[in-house]
Amino acid sequence: MFPRTYAVLGSTGNCGTALIENLLKTPDARIHAYCRNRPKLLQILPQLEESDRVTIFEGNIQDAELLQSCLRNCHAVFLVVSTNDNIPGCHLAQDTATAVIQALQDLKRNNPTSTVMPKLVLLSSATTDSQLSRDVPSLLRFILHRSASYVYEDLVVTEKLLHAQKDWLTSIFIKPGALSVDIQRGHALSQTDQDGPLSYLDLAAAMIEAADEETGCYDMQSLGVVNTNGKAKFPTGTPLCILVGLLRHYFPFLHPYLPMNTGPR
């Protein structure tokens, strides 16, 4: 297999680090890790310091020149800039997608004959998809949707934005259920089902599989991920995340006074 370069936008998050760990297992994969804080990334994954297969791009997502350098000649781009906190007015996913679209448009305009567009793989959620969440009890889905309402609205708008580019950009929408920081057990992609809790490592492996699929059967599709060798452990931080998220949904003025960085542990 010829060498492939993968860009990971949101490298310091649980999904971003899991993507890098999985990609490092593939000898011919090169990684462009985009982050705001290089020391934080190296603290999480110190092996990157000496790796000649990883290039770290430190900066804001609005740095057009840096982002173009990160995306140039990539096989796939993983859009995993997100938050577990239900922040009122959240637009992290929208900002990332908008910046990526603009950067790729600029690359294409500057090199119209030689620029090959990468596949974009967006981390979304099964809660936003009626098909993938059809087996979730209605009351639970009601609670889950409101506990991350601002984040989900951001994702819904982002998906529409990416769908609007389908004449020149291919996107894939990965929509897992509950996520957990746990070991890798085995996964399968599904267009009809999701199964949680799912480990971030299994999620990352599924995202890479979708990006590498060559027949195009996953292009512009929403995909769930199911466990194939047992579920991940229960994410202990999730109950607090749901509670605080509900408070932010119903009482957004409390946002500055509520804890941050809640979510799966």
Curated annotation (Swiss-Prot):
Lineage of origin: Eukaryota, Fungi, Dikarya, Ascomycota, Pezizomycotina
Pfam families, sorted: NAD_binding_10
Domain of life: Eukaryota
Top enzyme class: oxidoreductase
Family membership noted in the UniProt record: Belongs to the avfA family.
Pathway connected to this protein: Secondary metabolite biosynthesis
InterPro entries, alphabetized: NAD(P)-bd_dom, NAD(P)-bd_dom_sf
Function comment: Oxidoreductase; part of the gene cluster that mediates the biosynthesis of the tetrahydroxanthone dimer neosartorin, which exhibits antibacterial activity. The two different monomeric units appear to be synthesized by the same set of enzymes, among which the Baeyer-Villiger monooxygenase nsrF is the key enzyme for the divergence of the biosynthetic routes. The pathway begins with the synthesis of atrochrysone thioester by the polyketide synthase nsrB. The atrochrysone carboxyl ACP thioesterase nsrC then breaks the thioester bond and releases the atrochrysone carboxylic acid from AacuL.
Protein name: Oxidoreductase nsrR
One GO molecular-function entry: monooxygenase activity
The UniProt record lists the keyword Oxidoreductase: yes
Keyword Oxidoreductase carried by entry: yes
E.C. code: 1.-.-.-
Keywords: Monooxygenase, Oxidoreductase
